[in-house]
Amino acid sequence: MDFMNENQAAHGDREYGHMVTRMGIERKVVVGHWSDENVQNRIGSWMRTAIGIIESSHIRVMRVADNMRNVAVTEGDKVEAQLKFGWEVDAYPVNEIAACVDAVTEPDINALVDEYYDKYEILLEGRDAGEFKKHVAVQAQIEIGFERFLKEKNYHAIVTHFGDLGCLKQLPGLAIQRLMEKGYGFGA
């Protein structure tokens, strides 16, 4: 029976290949025995690409503010992104997101700052340690506020720019790097 199943799979694979060729559908074809490491690597590469395409088809992008004034390359084409890739790109006033940042509590900020200091080597050469820690706390507050906003609105990526900080006290540098580490997409 196993031998027959193998032959049936081969027959079905050929039938499928013939059908999609007639339909003009481009596809990836990997040939070889499943146990061959090269075949496994090629199939694995294809699978990762397929996952990326599927995941990309329903991305929701949050723009902090909208376009940077007088800088054409920041425009992008939100409609084309929706049509071509299926991405939803929404812009929010920076102060609406800043309100979410301002709502972060001191204990939450302190806990994340402690995590930063445990996880990263903080170089303080020539800097006042207490003053520097205050700046780090601002990044922690931004990270928490942005992440809460992203989760609440079900966004997968964020776009920021330095042309409009609104009520934010700093550019979201470390905060954005940490969001990327957590799997959020980022563009500027």
Kindly give the residue locations of the regions a language model identified.
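An N-terminal assembly and electron-transfer interface module characteristic of large anaerobic redox
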Residues: 1-188
